[in-house]
């Protein structure tokens, strides 16, 4: 099971008494701010949760798994997430059911 934006909005509705419309808009605004910051090359630091960073990946050699042909994997920018200490501590001993 995955946590969705709809789940987050529902939680705001239930715990803070937001209207459903305001809860959904709040979640959308939050994620839009994160997107904008990353698009502008900024780090996103969420205290007690973790950091989102942009990393540049250089071009590197790769291989087509079907044909075995060598192909270059182009340089690109990727988003990485590094969990903070508080998040790590909270999930450290959780048993995951499959």
From Swiss-Prot:
Stretches with biased composition (Basic and acidic residues): 53-69
Region (Disordered): 53-72
Keywords tagged on the record: DNA recombination, DNA-binding, Transcription, Transcription regulation, Translation regulation
Entry annotated with the keyword Transcription regulation: yes
Disulfide bonds: none
InterPro entries, per the entry: Hist_DNA-bd, Histone-like_DNA-bd_CS, IHF-like_DNA-bd_dom_sf, IHF_alpha
A single GO cellular-component term on record: cytosol
One Gene Ontology MF term: DNA binding
Xref: PANTHER family: DNA-BINDING PROTEIN HU, INTEGRATION HOST FACTOR SUBUNIT ALPHA
Chain's role: This protein is one of the two subunits of integration host factor, a specific DNA-binding protein that functions in genetic recombination as well as in transcriptional and translational control.
Family, per entry: Belongs to the bacterial histone-like protein family.
Subunit structure as annotated in this protein's UniProt entry: Heterodimer of an alpha and a beta chain.
Name of this protein: Integration host factor subunit alpha
Top-level taxonomy: Bacteria, Pseudomonadati, Pseudomonadota, Gammaproteobacteria, Vibrionales
């Amino acid at each position: 099971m995955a946590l969705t934006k709809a789940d987050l909005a529902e939680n705001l509705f239930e715990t803070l008494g937001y209207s459903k419309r305001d809860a959904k808009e709040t979640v959308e605004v939050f994620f839009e701010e994160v997107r904008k910051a990353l698009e502008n090359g900024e780090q996103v630091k969420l205290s007690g949760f973790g950091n989102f960073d942009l990393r540049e990946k250089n071009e590197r050699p790769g291989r087509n798994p079907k044909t075995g042909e060598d192909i270059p994997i182009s340089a690109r920018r990727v988003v990485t997430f590094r969990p903070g200490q508080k998040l790590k501590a909270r999930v450290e001993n959780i048993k995951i059911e499959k």
